[in-house]
């Protein structure tokens, strides 16, 4: 859309090496049918991540990194996204669990979807080998996907401690993650401490600080 095009034009002034394309999970809205009955409708934002990524890559010749989520996606829906990205020769991904739904107190997968990013990594690894979620196989002719994952210098809100976060980050790296991008942090010291802790734990991939420009105070 117009807003996204304007953002890309501004970003080009800084000669970015890549642009991350966020993904929004599907959400459910309830329509009042009267007589105490409600109809649940599943909605997903449009245009989708694949369309936005393809438009940016083709129009501006900038590498794009679409986000692939557990939240709001079944295994089959994830496979469709991977097939579309492969067809478009978009092979760099950021693999995330994603947020819980607005009405949830704890994270719940969509259908047969995944609880953890490491499970999503396994599906992508199998896809790179030509193995679909139903067990059927295809001949691999395209470049395989490479991907990064998330990490949390100030601890994930659901983690008991930073050691637990480091444990799972190491598992994600062992499963194939080539780098990690941090969640937003508000104390630079926490980032540098986390990088040193990761090295001490045997995590040797690049850890990139996640930075989000704020336009207004309420975004904090």
What do the predicted segments below correspond to?
Residues 1, 5-9:
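Single conserved hydrophobic/aromatic residue that forms the stacking wall/gate
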Residues 2-3, 17-21, 64-68, 93-95, ...:
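Hydrophobic faces of well-ordered beta-strands that scaffold small-molecule active sites
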Residues 10-47, 101-111, 177-193:
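Glycine-rich, proline-tolerant flexible connector loops at the mouths of alpha/beta enzymes
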Residues 23-27, 70-72, 97-101, 151-155, ...:
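Active-site-proximal loop/turn and secondary-structure-junction residues that shape catalytic pockets
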Residues 33-66, 112-149, 192-211:
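Alpha-helix-loop-beta-strand connector modules within alpha/beta enzyme cores
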Residues 74-86, 164-167, 193-196, 216-219:
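Catalytic cores of alpha/beta
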Residues 75-123:
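Flexible, glycine-rich active-site loops centered on histidine and acidic residues
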Residues 136-174, 178:
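Active-site/ligand-binding-proximal alpha/beta "capping" segment
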């Amino acid at each position: 859309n117009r807003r996204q095009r304007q953002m890309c034009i501004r970003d080009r002034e800084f000669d970015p090496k890549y642009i991350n394309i966020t993904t929004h999970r599907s959400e459910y809205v309830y329509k009042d049918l009267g007589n105490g009955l409600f109809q649940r409708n599943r909605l997903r934002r449009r245009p989708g991540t694949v369309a936005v990524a393809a438009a940016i890559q083709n129009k501006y010749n900038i590498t794009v990194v679409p986000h692939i989520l557990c939240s709001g996606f079944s295994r089959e829906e994830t496979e469709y996204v991977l097939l579309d990205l492969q067809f478009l020769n978009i092979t760099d991904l950021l693999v995330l669990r994603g947020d819980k739904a607005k009405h949830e107190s704890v994270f719940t997968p969509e259908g047969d979807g995944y609880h953890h990013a490491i499970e999503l990594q396994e599906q992508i690894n199998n896809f790179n080998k030509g193995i679909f979620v139903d067990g059927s196989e295809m001949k691999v002719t395209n470049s395989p996907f490479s991907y990064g994952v998330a990490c949390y210098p100030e601890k994930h809100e659901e983690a008991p401690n930073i050691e637990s976060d480091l444990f799972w980050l190491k598992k994600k790296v062992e499963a194939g993650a080539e780098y990690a991008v941090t969640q937003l942090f508000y104390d630079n010291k926490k980032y540098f401490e986390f990088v040193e802790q990761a090295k001490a734990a045997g995590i040797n991939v690049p850890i990139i600080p996640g930075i989000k420009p704020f336009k207004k105070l309420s975004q904090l």
